[in-house]
């Protein structure tokens, strides 16, 4: 599945946002299809009850049971910065081939510095994923070596927070190697990553070889190891997740302390901390479950919030008051601000996005720029002849785009997820 086609979000996500649109920033002027925007905005501060209703609706669309409350976690650590590189790559694609998908800055709260952490292979993994998660190393203290001449480091990652129904399509362990000038200047290292199968008291753990790399001691940069198979095993069997073990040896078999080999551990700079990243794709069973329950949940939420009907009425009054004569079906501005909702502590990017909405008349005769369907044309003719029998066609989105959201979960892991049908690209009569 292409990254721009996430099926996990409901096809009518824009409806839940349209209902309380007067609470956001709604433009009353025309929006032409060539993106020439001339608009005025309604601004007012959300009341507490309105804010809670808005938050509940959008959290439902995002597939989150509650508002994440991450622990204090630096946004400039290596894992969030890597995820931001992926987010930026996605944002470029979502802007459309003409680069005019969004009239508002589709940007993060902060930006990466220096060369990108994400590789071309990571970008390739994105094309078959609808969610990406990064995981921080949970090991705080290294165990004592049972063999004085065998050096290794251990890493452990919590995969218990992965949403149900998500399958791992690719997973990587990433660790940074600094340039070293002394002692091993002309050496070649063999760096090996193992899965810990079983731990023992008094002797070394049972290990399973996952991946290895041969590098020069003078090399510098991120080392990436494939751990896809073991990650899938951990997701299915969480009790078997005993972590990873890394060792460094010279070509003649001498064990080297990873720190002396230039490998950065948990005490190194924040932007060089080791981490794990996994790419996920929702299974078909999970997608069907989302489709069947998503609409029910949002319907229940709206039935509990009668103010949404009042929101629709006020939005209609505001629209009608802007002009004595109703305008033809067109796209209008609607900007959703995550910052205004007070979510800047857990949503890394974007600060908000331009959702837009469709509004206007579908009256006879229908012009070509109205993108009317054949059925809408026939319905318009019948309505023109007998308006009391058949209503006019409705102004609705004809093209919808996806957005990417980058955020922390409760465990301070970073999640990058695609949500389809969140941005109106074009409107027409249906």
Swiss-Prot record:
CDD domains: TGF_beta_BMP7. Residues 1-29 form the signal peptide. It holds the Pfam family TGF_beta. Keywords: Chondrogenesis, Cytokine, Developmental protein, Differentiation, Disulfide bond, Glycoprotein, Growth factor, Osteogenesis, Secreted, Signal. Residues 30-291 form a propeptide. Belongs to the TGF-beta family. PANTHER family: BONE MORPHOGENETIC PROTEIN 7, TGF-BETA FAMILY. Homodimer; disulfide-linked. Interacts with SOSTDC1. Interacts with TWSG1. Interacts with FBN1 (via N-terminal domain) and FBN2. Interacts with type I receptor ACVR1. Interacts with type II receptor ACVR2A. Interacts with NOG; this interaction inhibits canonical BMP signaling. Interacts with SCUBE3. Interacts with ERFE; the interaction inhibits BMP-induced transcription of HAMP. Interacts with TGFBR3. This is Bone morphogenetic protein 7. It comes from Mus musculus.
